[in-house]
Amino acid sequence: MKIALYAGSFDPLTNGHIAILQGSFVLADKVVVAIGIQAKKKSLFSFEERVDLITQVGKDLLSIGPDRLQVISFDTLLIDKAREIGASFLIRGLRDGTDLDYEMQMAGMNGVMAPELQTVFLPASVSGRAITSTLVRQIASMGGDVSAFVPPNVERALHLKFQSSRENGCVS
């Protein structure tokens, strides 16, 4: 069984992430989405909320069951988590040349530390190249329409999150 590991913060999950996830299922029998947990980084959505959002997208939009999609956390080196779950390769999405430069550097370092793990780069779709979780959060925090950038369940979750923040007078 070929297992792919797709890591990120997914805060929130965007249509760009989903396109990369779809491409991952063409290459792998099972995809493990690994949400990076960083103590110093304040997330908008909790780990549990992100798991729910990703799992729901897998089921509802991609028609992928729990036998092919698993969501986990990691706070270690990515290669250590990949080895732990038996991953055959790492999936990385590329939006532009800046991503490529960074990801090639990371793939090179990972290749030295874990030569048995390959990194597979999947290019973002034309419509997904401009999407970043940071921009989506900023637009949503100001009450903007993010429906073109995220799936419906994430759009609802963002709306609820920021509506609550605005009602309490603390928009981040």
UniProtKB/Swiss-Prot annotation:
GO terms for molecular function: ATP binding; pantetheine-phosphate adenylyltransferase activity. Keywords: ATP-binding, Coenzyme A biosynthesis, Cytoplasm, Magnesium, Nucleotide-binding, Nucleotidyltransferase, Transferase. CDD domains: PPAT (cd02163). Reversibly transfers an adenylyl group from ATP to 4'-phosphopantetheine, yielding dephospho-CoA (dPCoA) and pyrophosphate. This is Phosphopantetheine adenylyltransferase. Pathway: Cofactor biosynthesis; coenzyme A biosynthesis; CoA from (R)-pantothenate: step 4/5. It catalyses: (R)-4'-phosphopantetheine + ATP + H(+) = 3'-dephospho-CoA + diphosphate. Its EC number is 2.7.7.3. Pfam families: CTP_transf_like. PANTHER family: PHOSPHOPANTETHEINE ADENYLYLTRANSFERASE. It comes from the Bacteria. One of its GO terms (cellular component) is cytoplasm. Belongs to the bacterial CoaD family. Its cofactor is Mg(2+). GO terms for biological process: coenzyme A biosynthetic process. ATP binds at residues 9-10, 17, 93-95, 103, 128-134. It is an enzyme of class 2 (transferase).
